[in-house]
Each structure stands twice: as structure tokens, then as C-alpha cells.
């Protein structure tokens, strides 16, 4: 049968917000599982709209065979521009795990994926690409039974800034 994927996720709303600014999409193809995490700029309703649009666009286009360049271009052209910040912005991560053990990971402005094998933190070989002026991290690697891959939005590493955790929650601390 090959590699199977167990997926779990948790989204927490920012304090006092009704909607979460993060969105997760889970998709399946005949030979793979696809996980998409998007985080809209800001918080609440605006962030939720940006992340929902981003995750839905990426999911639909990815399933229909669009290239990464086409996906990034469509997101750039589609997201509504914030009247205050004058940008349209959402971070995203796409993780596709094939049943044969091949994995494909794309990250744009989210903290790096945590990859654990046999209790040890693994480094994933990356290829940095620039698409429409955006630095996109792209990875191709192998996974095996028992591996754990953890995607997170920047809300994770910025949790508690200036309050409980003066400088947020460092990626290395989360990985450890």
C-alpha cells in the first residue's frame, strides 16, 4: 500500500476575534494527500477572507495541475488589497505526500516545516525560487512510515510576543 497520512490540525482565534486568520485545506488525489495552510494578514474577518481565498485557490489549482507559478500569479491578482496597508497578502504552505514516499513542500512566509524521523529533527533540502518577486521555498524529499511533519503559521512563532513570551516562541523551541 505504501505511505499513508494521518492529519490533525488546530486553529486558535486571536483573543477577542470571532474568526481565525488561518485556514487549512485537506485534499486527496488517487496517489497522494495534500495539506494546505494559509494565514491571512492581520486577524479576524480580513485575515479569514484572505486565508480562505488563498487555500481554496491553491487547492483548486493544484488539484487541476496548475504550476506553482500559475498559483502564485493567481493569488497575487485575486486577493483584495487592504485599504490600510495597501497590500494583498497571505502566507501559505503546501505539503503533498505521495503514497510512494515522495513529498513535495512549498512554503511562502510561513515558519519552516518541522520534520521529525525516529525522534530526530531532520533537515529538508530546499530550493529557493523567486516568483513575482516573492521568495518561495520549495522542497522535494522522501518520507517513510513513522515520520512526522508539522506545518505552522507565523501566529505560532509570534504567540505571546510582549506578554507571556517576550520574543515569541522560537522555531527551535517548538521543534525541540
Language model features: what each stretch is:
Residues 1-18:
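Regulatory cytosolic signal-relay segments
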Residues 17-30, 123-161:
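Acidic loop->beta-strand submotif enriched in PP2C/PPM serine/threonine phosphatases
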Residues 20, 49-119, 129-130, 136:
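Catalytic core of PPM/PP2C metal-dependent serine/threonine phosphatase domains
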Residues 28-31, 35, 46:
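Membrane-embedded alpha-helical signal segments
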Residues 36, 107, 149-151:
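Residue-level marker for buried hydrophobic side chains located in beta-strands
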